Amino acid sequence: MQGNAYNGDCSTLTEVKARMIREDIDVFCLQESGNFFGSISAECWNRIFPEYEFYVARNMQIGTSSRGILVNVYYVAYGKENLRCSMAIIVKSELDTGKAAITYINPNLRPVIGVLLNDNTAVYNIHAPSGNHNFAASVTYCFLQEIQDFKLKYNIDNYVLIGDFNCPPDVMKKNVTYANKTHYADEATQNSGACLDYCIASISPQNMYINKNAAFSDHRQVVMDF
């Protein structure tokens, strides 16, 4: 789901972590994540790839030491001037292999970032460009081709591409070869009434629901159980 891109005090990460405990969420994908650097000590961040502003902070404590959990926070940073392009994946440390991916199809577009879980499932976070549904679908198709290449190259069993596609599922199905693997709840995920947040995956969710309280932005939290 989307965060508050103009959230300079970094409270978005605090709320995400609280929800992970409250709702027992394993992986949380966030678009427009804002500025995460202010909420985690600078020495905790490690840059994953030298050529990208892609960082990870590992084994961050959520909750109390006796009842809390440890999470790894993956974050693509674009500085304080372009927070709408920042993205994050927060994953329970015990489920994370520590292997991550980032891919661009165009330097002027937001990337897709991904993590590999210990059941050999890769989870990718997407924030497709807005304004034109067909263009958003074509960008998604290009990313899915990259994901298929990753799957074959690294012998990954399954993938889940989830996030804000900026394209309704019916348009996506007309434009994307892999759209038969599109999974969505048949209701609005944005306050405008549009369904833009869902997943395209090689496995099917057993359950999904929409949190109608858009606490972070005008997009609602989409929860899927695999």
Residue ranges and their predicted role:
Residues 1-72, 84, 141-142, 160, ...:
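N-terminal, active-site-proximal structural segment of metallo-dependent hydrolase catalytic domains
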Residues 87-98, 107-128, 226:
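Beta-strand-turn-beta hairpins that frame and shape the catalytic cleft
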Residues 101, 149-160, 165-226:
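Metal-dependent phosphoester-hydrolase catalytic domains
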Residues 1-4, 30-34, 59, 73-81, ...:
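Active-site-proximal beta-strand/loop segments in catalytic clefts of secreted hydrolases
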Residues 3-5, 99-105, 127-138:
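Surface-exposed cleft-lining segments at the edges of enzyme active sites
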Residues 62-69, 81-98, 192-206, 226:
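Conserved beta strand-loop-helix elements of the APE1-like EEP
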Residues 14-15, 101-113, 185-186:
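Alpha-helical scaffolding within the catalytic cores
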Residues 124-145, 169-172:
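Active-site-proximal segments of metal-dependent phosphoesterases and phosphodiesterases across multiple
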